[in-house]
Amino acid sequence: MCIRDRLEASPEEASLDSGRPLELVDLINACKIQVGKRFVFVEGAGGIYSPIANNALNSDLAAALGLPIIIIVKDELGAVGQALLSINAANSQKLKIACVVLNEFEPNHLSNAQALRAYTKIPVLEYSRAKSKLFLSEAEKLI
């Protein structure tokens, strides 16, 4: 299920702006049709506590589906704090975390992965164009 609206906003706000309010039950039903039939990847927009439907957050959808989540954080200054806050939020909602991915947009010399691994036992993967084959190999081990 892919929802596209003209307004660049949260899915909740965009759906209200378009006159087609999006309800959590609609998202759950669209996703559950696929669960058990094949590999299911559900991409949220924003973070764990970002609105995704009328009066619903990404965390509500994740909890309803019961699928493991992947936390993706831009690999930059502040990434460790952002990742740890997201991990804490997911844990408080009793969501299963498959891994954290540090997504490197621009080459950097930060040691965010090493720092993050010191604070969590959750697998931490690093993605960059230069390391894409290694990333895929590590990700396949988790699936």
What are these regions (language model features)?
Residues M1-I3:
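Short, small-residue-biased leader/transition segments that mark boundaries at the very start
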Residues A45-G46, E76, F105, S128:
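Anionic group-transfer/hydrolysis microenvironments
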Residues P11-I52, S59:
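Phosphate-binding/switch loop-helix module in NTP-utilizing enzymes
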Residues A53-D75:
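Inter-motif core of Ras-like GTPase G domains
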Residues A53-D60, L84-I87, L110-Q114:
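Charged helix-capping and loop-helix junction motifs
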Residues I87-I143:
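C-terminal lobe/tail of nucleotide-utilizing enzymes
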Residues V73-G81, L85-N88:
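Active-site beta-alpha connecting loops in nucleotide-dependent enzymes
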Residues F41-E43, I70-I72, V101:
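Structural motif
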